[in-house]
């Protein structure tokens, strides 16, 4: 287990005193009443929330540790205080119903009187004036208009829009003194949840704290069940769900890419790339308007059969003339031999040719074959990305297969169209259009 702030106790639940702690009622009381003996990650979550130095707690914790269980228990404890508002944000309807049932079960178990219960809007108002609300990250607007004391993001990383939902809609609702937010999840690669997790290690953000735990930190975990899962699920899924590993995730397209092997500082190799006879220089272009237009400059080395990505460009809502100016810059700087553009962007190619005298060819379009080609090249170490191409690196790490609407089932028929698509498409257009087996 790892905690970003070393002073956070992971062995014993600490009482910070009624004047300083977050929960007015002692956490030890609800733990004893419920017969809960918390494990290390659960203790860390409790103490991190109780500590007045923290407002935002990010817990990247694997399955079989009880992160959601302890979070909902703490949310219920907060509701026992008068005139408190607790919001739980869930990524989908299924998880929302689980949380709703857990809170309702605790309210019923302790015989709390309710003034209002709205199953449709997922709201419960208690007789003490406290309110529990459950919302989805995709519809965070439904939760604004109130000031919350405690916001819990359950399985936060599952929703791609959770980060924006918090930054734009929900963080302004934490305007009460000592209001806090808890983000709990298994990871999903390098999305916004990883960014929030990194905040806890930033010394300039002392009110953030991060916790990492796996099934090994739960002494009550069934190791036989864990080993059966290891044998029956994919390697990436096991590392994601049971190791809480940010570096891989189920559905990751370029799981053969890793920054250690495939990202290099190529600035010191300029003399190497100046040998025009040894290289072919390519541009791969994915065209968009509201979506960004992405351009990658790629050097293909004949002798080693290796592709070097030297420069990236990604701009939205620009004119063809503005994109053409950048493309001409690349042509002049890198002596570009061939330009491959999304075959669906015929008008863009025509405008480049007739208005800017830039010739291009339609890229090979087969998506699955092109992705398989790139996967194999990464596996063979045949694609190297310059360290300055930070957006491409992020895209490669987070590009994933699409999910069917409302399901966890992956579709491997097509990639998900999101912010990671554009540079990955440009890479595919540039490389697959000249690759082996053409």
UniProtKB/Swiss-Prot annotation:
Where is the motif (Walker A motif)?
62-68
Q: Where is this motif: Walker B motif?
A: 150-155
Q: Which Gene3D superfamilies does its entry note?
A: 3.30.420.280, P-loop containing nucleotide triphosphate hydrolases
Q: Which InterPro entries match?
A: P-loop_NTPase, Terminase_6C, Terminase_large_su_gp17-like, Viral_DNA_packaging_terminase
Q: Where does Mg(2+) 2 bind?
A: 286, 342
**Upregulating conditions:** Expressed in the late phase of the viral replicative cycle.
Q: Which chain regions cross the lipid bilayer?
A: none
Q: Name one GO cellular component term.
A: viral terminase, large subunit
Q: Does the keyword Metal-binding apply?
A: yes
- What are its E.C. numbers? 3.6.4.-, 3.1.21.-
**What are the UniProt keywords, alphabetically?**
ATP-binding, Endonuclease, Hydrolase, Magnesium, Metal-binding, Nuclease, Nucleotide-binding, Viral genome packaging, Viral release from host cell
Binding annotation for Mg(2+) 1: 286, 418
Question: GO:BP terms for this protein?
Answer: chromosome organization; viral DNA genome packaging
**In the record's cofactor note, how is the cofactor described as bound?**
ATPase activity requires 1 Mg(2+) ion per subunit. Nuclease activity probably requires 2 Mg(2+) ions per subunit.
Q: Per the record's keyword annotation, is Metal-binding included, yes or no?
A: yes
Q: Give the Gene Ontology MF terms in alphabetical order.
A: ATP binding; ATP hydrolysis activity; endonuclease activity; metal ion binding; nuclease activity
User: Which Pfam family, an example, fits this chain?
Assistant: Terminase_6N
List cofactor names only: Mg(2+)
Question: How is the subunit organization of this protein annotated in UniProt?
Answer: Interacts with the terminase small subunit; the active complex is probably heterooligomeric. Interacts with the portal protein.
Q: Of which family is this protein a member?
A: Belongs to the Tequatrovirus large terminase family.
Q: What is known of its domains?
A: The N-terminus contains an ATPase domain. The C-terminus contains an endonuclease domain.
What this chain does, per the entry, is described as: The terminase large subunit acts as an ATP driven molecular motor necessary for viral DNA translocation into empty capsids and as an endonuclease that cuts the viral genome to initiate and to end a packaging reaction The terminase lies at a unique vertex of the procapsid and is composed of two subunits, a small terminase subunit involved in viral DNA recognition (packaging sequence), and a large terminase subunit possessing endonucleolytic and ATPase activities. Both terminase subunits heterooligomerize and are docked on the portal protein to form the packaging machine.
Designated name of the protein: Terminase, large subunit
Which organism's genome codes for this protein? Escherichia phage T5 (Enterobacteria phage T5)
